[in-house]
Amino acid sequence: MLSSITVRTKSGRLIPLVLAATLLAACSGRISTTPPAPVQSEATASADYYLQQMQQSSDDSKADWQLLAIRALLREGKLPQADDLLGQLPSQLTEAQQLEQRLVSAELEIARHAPQQAQAILSKLDISLLSQAQQLRYYQAVIAAVQGKTTLAQIRAYIALQPLLTQENQRKSNIDATWTALNTLTPADLNSMVINANEDILRGWLDLLRLYQDNRQDPALLKAAIKEWQTRYPNNPAATMLPSALDNILHLQSDSTASIALLLPLNGQAKVFSDAIEAGFNAAKNGAFNQNSAAVTTDGTPTAQVDAPAQPDVNAAGAVSTSTQSADATASVLPADSAALPPLDAAGDPIAPSVSPGNPDAHIQVYDTSSQPLPELLSQAQQAGVSLVIGPLLKNNVDQLNTISTPLNILALNQPEQVQNHPNICYFALSPEDEARDAARHIWAQGKRTPLLLIPRNPLGDRVAKAFATEWQSLGGGSVLRQTFGSSAELRSTINSGTGIRLTGQPVSITPAQPTSVTIAGLTIPAPVQPPVASGGGVDAVYIIATPAEITLIKPMIDLANGTHNGISLYASSRSYQAGAGPDFRLEMEGVQFSDIPLLAGSDPAILQQAPAQYRNDYSLMRLYAMGADAWTLANHFAQLRQIPGFQVQGATGTLSASDNCVIQRKLPWLQYQKGSIVPVL
């Protein structure tokens, strides 16, 4: 046995000689070595640092540093370099390195906007083998790989991600993101979901969504329902940290409407429009639109039709654009042999009015936008104690709102070309463009995918085409075709030639929307601008913007050139609606669907008959009268529109809701000519 040799240190302690020699050798001959690479941890350093460590490391740890460098390159937005380095990984990797290789490969595919490839990679990963940091990245990747329609897998990923987040702001953001994703699910999505018995958190989220959708029209009922839900699901993260949108609703304070300012042009060409809006506003304020009268008269028939003289479209001059009618057009409600149309929900069931009438004692002040600059009028209104402004009406005035700073809540009666999100401004437009956007949504919902716009060869047609195509592409549609026509004389000439109208248009050119970004593993990457998807196959839907006289010529020519059983659905705007037309016209229009505001579609003939005669006898002014009534309703629910996603009111101009930028969207009733009658499209 070797003898134990010891050395006495200066402190008097004894240590083995071999150990002392080792310590001395370590101190005198220290060699600089690369620290171990934490391949399963967070990669917080720069790509240059990891690349340097990779160059200095041995073969055993080189791949670890290489994987960390790839992640850093992704975070820095250097996708080509990350891709090159990923391709240089050795073929022989440890199990831990292989897991990281697959995870970072999925992250790269997401950054390159290849979600399907990313999903294929992620589906092969065993989550149980991942570290906590890797699991966090995995669920972030699953969420980011669902670009577009929300899926159940994405909702589950949000739920699994929540306990992995360590900072309160991260947990709050994830709860808000979960809630946002849930609110994009359709009734069909919810009905088709299969929930496992152990998914109590998911079940709680879905119950919260249901009670929100059932009670969002009444904050008091919603508050009580949420309190009961928190008792039933105490372990759900939202039970102690509500989504911001829900929390805002529970603390919603309705804005005062004790004093309202109307900003309207009281002189010039637009005065007639202002008068109609003000009349409808005052009628609604005084309760004329709160009678909930039946959609038919006592003998079961709608009210009689009235003549509708033409009105000029002064949108080019900046005023609100209204649908025009030719002098021989008539319109108000459905003909006597048709069913009236009450407001319907998505299932086709009647909807009862869901909002309170507002404050009838509100003080109304009217300001003339044609006599003073808009900033001065807003300043005067503020000094007068006004709490809410309705208007301006003219488009050039509405455009100025982006450059004016005011604390007043504003319901503008038009919409600028480029809408900016202001927390105190909503936009309510009654225009052919607005109607075209609703038509795009309706046609899309009917399963059509290759529409053609048949529009007049003038600025009105251009504006409608742009609005329709923009909305269509926002829904996920491809390019939209447009085909123009000239005067009635030109249309008659085409009839005489016997050629008809062949549906062969040119793509509508629009400026693509700003691309969204993708955030993955801490990196926010702008999405590339994608060109519109080309529409495949033939035209399956035609949206027609024409007067009654024009559509009388157009419809037969479409049938002549394409046949009456061609599978192409025809849609028309309210511009072509001629309620007073006889059975011959209605038979000629067989199958055509068209939209109109509820008040003129027969939802409440009693209210229509109570309107002043000068508006009942003018189709376009009656629309503005209804717009004024809805302006009163919207003003009294301004806070809800701004803060409650999905909040709706049943108005005289449609079912009204607000987009993210508080642009009021109108869902219009759709009607159809069927065997000489007009029936609702359900």
From Swiss-Prot:
Tell me where it resides. Answer: Cell outer membrane
Lipidation feature positions (S-diacylglycerol cysteine):
27
For membrane topology, the record states:
Lipid-anchor
Instruction: State the Gene Ontology BP annotations.
Output: peptidoglycan biosynthetic process; regulation of cell shape
Q: Which Pfam families match?
A: LppC (PF04348)
Signal peptide span: 1-26
- Identify the GO cellular component terms for this protein: periplasmic side of cell outer membrane
What is the top-level taxon of the source organism? Bacteria
Does this entry carry the keyword Transferase? no
Keyword line: Cell outer membrane, Cell shape, Lipoprotein, Membrane, Palmitate, Peptidoglycan synthesis, Signal
Task: Please give the InterPro entries that the UniProt record associates with this protein.
Answer: LpoA (IPR007443), Peripla_BP_I (IPR028082), TPR-like_helical_dom_sf (IPR011990)
Q: Name the residues where the record annotates lipidation as N-palmitoyl cysteine.
A: 27
Any one GO MF annotation of this record: enzyme regulator activity
What family name appears in the similarity comment? Belongs to the LpoA family.
What's the stated role of this polypeptide? Answer: Regulator of peptidoglycan synthesis that is essential for the function of penicillin-binding protein 1A (PBP1a).
Subunit structure comment from the entry: Interacts with PBP1a.
Question: What is the protein's given name?
Answer: Penicillin-binding protein activator LpoA
Q: Which organism is it from?
A: Edwardsiella ictaluri (strain 93-146)
